[in-house]
Every structure is written in C-alpha cells, then in structure tokens.
Amino acid sequence: INDVEITDPLVLECGETLTKHEIIYETYGELNESRSNAVLICHALSGNHHAAGLNENGVSGGWDNYIGPGKPIDTNLFHVISITNIGSCFGSTGPATINKAPGKFWSASFPALEVSDWVKSQKMLMDVLKIKTWLAVIGGSLGGMQAMEWSVLYPDCVKSSVIIAASLKLSAQNIAFNEIARRSIQSDENFKNGDYLNLGLTPSKGLALAR
C-alpha cells in the first residue's frame, strides 16, 4: 500500500478547494523503463485500492480474477495502479479522515464531489508518478464513468479505455434508488447530521437498510 500527499490545490466542481489531499493506492507488476505500461483501475462506489491478491485481513481484491501473472490484466506485462478515491472511507482524504485545521474528522463538512473531481485527483497522482500516458484506464459501474471521464478530460493521456457496466448518465430509477439509500442512512438516529464519527457513533442500522 502506498500513500502520496498531493500538495497542489484541487479546485472541485462544487466551487470549494482542497489545498492538499492524500491518495492511497496499490500497485501490481513493474513499471517499465519508458513508463509506458501503466494501467489505471478505477473502483466502483463501495470499492477501494485493494484490487488483487490478499490484503492484511486475508481478503481478496475485487479484480483478483483479472489482475496477476498470466491473467487478462497480466502483471508480467503491465504496471497496474489501483487507488482509493478522495471522499471514500478507505484512507484517501475524505469524511473519515482528519481535517488538520480543526483537528476533527471531516465528516459532513467534506465537500461534495463529482466524477470529474476524482479524475482530476487521479491526474495529479499520475503527474507525481511521472507517468505521461495510461496504456489503459479500466473501471466498472462508477469506475466505468471515471474511465469515460478520463477520455473526455485528458484524451491525450489515455491510449484506451475499458468501460464496464457504465453509462453516460444515470436513469431516473437509479437516481431514485440512490436517494432512498441516502435517506435511509440519514434517518438513523446515530447519523447526527453526518457528524457521527466525531461523536464515536456509527449509523449501522441506516446503512444496513440502504444496502
């Protein structure tokens, strides 16, 4: 597991700015001398940086059937990078990390994010790693939307995109389901307007209902 602090400001679509942020990521396979064999994996809504192999808890990565020696995303050939997006709860800067200014969890004060914000953050990591072009950007569902956004925002940085189970926009039904899930979590008595982490609480009943 790798941890990189991005020190350049990231201006978000909502108008707010992250003056700096951290990104957690894992790598598989070796980066070649020309740095031209890098593949980016973009995770779905509840995914994270752990894409292949077993983590410290013995859990297989979500792409374990596809990433590895001799597998479709062959790590004998490719250098695979899988990150946890900002705003997630798996280590990258987000509601579950500490906002150093007040010294508390970001919680509900963390800015709203859009797909383009994740892609811009990923591009900043790409620059830190001195990778000029992705051989491929791959993602499913919400990750597929990120792969699509890469092709729109940075077409010269992507040789190919693999977009799985993703569309250009959500249907009204999908938006409605997500809103029901959101309200289920917010209705939990432990949600506390999103500040539950600073109070040592977990809205587990609302989350169970939402999922």
Name what the model sees in each region.
Residues 1-38, 55:
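Catalytic-loop region of hydrolases
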Residues 65, 85, 124-128, 149:
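Residue-level signal for well-ordered alpha-helical scaffold segments within enzymatic catalytic domains
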Residues 132-176:
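Conserved hydrolase catalytic core segment
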Residues 26, 30-99:
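N-terminal cap/lid subdomain of alpha/beta-hydrolase-fold enzymes
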Residues 157-158, 163-211:
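Alpha/beta-hydrolase-fold enzymes
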Residues 102-109, 116-136, 145:
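Conserved acidic catalytic loop of the alpha/beta-hydrolase fold
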Residues 16-19, 34, 76, 129-132, ...:
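Structured loop/turn residues at beta-strand edges in well-structured enzyme cores
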Residues 99-104, 157-158:
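A short alpha->loop->secondary-structure connector
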